């Protein structure tokens, strides 16, 4: 039988995690850490910065334990900039055209969270402008993910805690699974699109061609699309919330059947759906 002290300890830990997450999503940054021994404040919160010139690569694989991840298409060079608690937390290598980056805390049996007035640990990857990446795989635990100006064939992004931001990106196939955080995609063009979100708002501005599927448990979904309404078949439904198409509020499940190849499916448990089409 679980002792009273154990129950109290578990409750306090859960409360600490909840408060830390609230602080993080309110704009806070890393300060309190947790490992198998419990909560602690790191003795050194100063970030170590380093820049690495990289050889060319065609695919990207990122496994991120903590910190923000940013990929930018800019200039003519392949480059990696890092800001982490310890330089040993970041490793990278290129094998058969695939760049693999891993960021892991020194105490690998724990995880990190917290809030305070600190700069965010981060990795920032630069690829030459107009480069088309074959495949991108990102598995991120804590931290925001941002992609700017990138072209890719396939992207698979798994994000546990943190916001996701895309700007001016083009992809043949995009798959995103997010647990906690908002998703904002601006100037996006995709030919196949899948989003699974548990908690957070979804805001997309761009063109969704082919089969596009969005499912969410909690949060609103807003789509400002450049597609013509007559070219898109759609199936929009929310269990608790409103559905609006081109500023016209409708109730229940809203569908349109077309013979074309472009299909949009949005299914929410709790939240509003707002879609605008040309």
Which residues are covered by each model-predicted region?
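Alpha-helical transmembrane segments and their membrane-interface anchoring/capping motifs
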Residues: 1-65, 70-74, 132, 246, ...
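A broad, low-specificity signal for short, low-complexity segments enriched in glycine/proline
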Residues: 24, 32-33, 40-43, 58-65, ...
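Right-handed parallel beta-helix
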Residues: 44-59, 68-77, 90-177, 182-186, ...
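Short, polar loop motifs at secondary-structure junctions
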Residues: 85-87
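Short, surface-exposed interaction patches in beta-rich subdomains
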Residues: 168, 174, 183-278
């Amino acid at each position: 039988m679980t002792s009273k002290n154990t129950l109290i300890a578990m409750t306090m830990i859960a409360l600490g995690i909840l408060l830390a997450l609230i602080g993080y999503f309110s704009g806070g940054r890393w300060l309190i850490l947790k490992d198998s021994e419990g909560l602690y404040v790191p003795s050194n919160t100063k970030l170590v910065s380093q820049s690495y010139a990289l050889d060319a690569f065609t695919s990207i694989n990122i496994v991120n334990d903590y910190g923000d991840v940013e990929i930018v298409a800019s200039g003519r060079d392949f480059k990696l900039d890092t800001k982490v608690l310890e330089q040993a937390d970041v490793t990278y290598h290129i094998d058969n055209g695939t760049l693999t980056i891993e960021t892991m805390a020194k105490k690998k049996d724990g995880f990190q969270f917290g809030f305070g007035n600190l700069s965010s640990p981060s990795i920032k990857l630069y690829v030459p402008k107009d480069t088309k990446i074959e495949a991108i795989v990102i598995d991120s635990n804590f931290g925001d993910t941002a992609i700017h100006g990138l072209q890719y064939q396939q992207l698979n992004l798994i994000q546990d805690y943190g916001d996701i931001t895309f700007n001016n990106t083009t992809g043949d196939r995009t798959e995103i699974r997010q647990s906690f955080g908002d998703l904002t995609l601006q100037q996006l063009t995709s030919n196949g699109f899948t989003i699974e979100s548990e908690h957070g708002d979804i805001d997309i501005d761009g063109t969704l061609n082919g089969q596009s599927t969005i499912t969410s448990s909690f949060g609103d979904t807003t789509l400002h699309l450049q597609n013509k309404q007559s070219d898109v078949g759609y199936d929009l439904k929310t269990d608790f919330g409103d559905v609006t198409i081109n500023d016209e509020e409708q109730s229940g499940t809203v569908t349109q059947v077309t013979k074309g190849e472009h299909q949009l499916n949005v299914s929410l448990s709790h939240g509003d759906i707002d879609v605008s089409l040309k």
